[in-house]
Amino acid sequence: MVAEQGTPKRLHFDFVGAVLWLVRILAILAVVIGAFVSLTSGRLSAAAWLNFVVIGIGQGAIYALIALGYTMVYGVLGFINFAHGEVFMSGAMVGAFAANSLAQAGMWNSSPILSILIVLLIAMATSTLVALLLERVAYRRLRNAPRLIPLITSIGASFFIQYAFLGLFGAQTRTYPALSILDGFISVAGLNIRYADIMVIGAAVVMMVGLYTFVERTKAGRALRAVAEDKEIAALMGVNVNRTIVLTFAVGGAMAGAAALLFGVVFRTVFFFSGFLFGIKAFTAAVLGGIGNIVGAMLGGLTLGIFESVGPSLVLTGLGIPSAHQLKDVVAFLALVLVLIFKPTGLLGERLSEERA
């Protein structure tokens, strides 16, 4: 069959792709212009910028610990547990109650290390228990359901936990008592580092290294990775899939509980809705690092924390936007949008198969 000579070829124009490229270019220009104006204005010293970075690392460490729960559950079960922010909130709320009880008993500042360890164990135990209840009651029967079903269930579970804690603790804000040993800062080459940031960063690093070692070096960790790779083959190899899934929720809950204590010690206030905002930010961190990748969650949390701390002064102020630091939450959510536009797989993520997506 001979093709007709005079038939013109149809040109296909990808309108959505063109818009995305335009958004990419505008975003890069905005960041470059804002950063250039801020850095050349001399408004802040180098030490001030470094202070922003240190504060961002401290915040990012908390995001990273919470993000681990999102990424571990996704890696094993393939769905996003949007109730994980409330797992974090439950540990923070009960931790505040425990911390105030210790303060009334005179232990909080007289024996600060012991008090922190006690509240840490209580917060981790609470968050772990809530995570295990979620797995048992809300998700276990939905393991073979379409991915949309457990996703919707997790949103419902999130609201249920929020209002359960509203009924238990009321709508008022709970405050952690001040910890005298964390007052003040240390000066290093003109850089003022708060003791609270040192504690948060140090504790988070220890826990993240411990988790990485657990996943990579232990038999239970190898089982977890095997189930994440393929449940059926893992079961044929003798791995107890059900127990491994329960362990995944338990570990994610424990990390969220640890983050809850660090959050309480640094920010000091918590209420029944606190888990929503921090949960969304931690989810953003997981996506930024590559959802399903444990190291990616850690890296994503730290990156988001620094971006949220430095971004308003570096970019927004340079663009002439007033009260830039009041927009740090906007910066965090903007980061999620930009990641989804520029690199949907995240920093360390891999392109998903159709089955997992």
Predicted segments with their positions:
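Cytosolic-side transmembrane-helix boundaries in multi-pass membrane proteins
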Residues: 1-38, 168, 229-236, 240-243, ...
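Helix-loop-helix "hairpin" substructures at the membrane interface of multi-pass membrane proteins
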Residues: 59, 192-271, 294-300
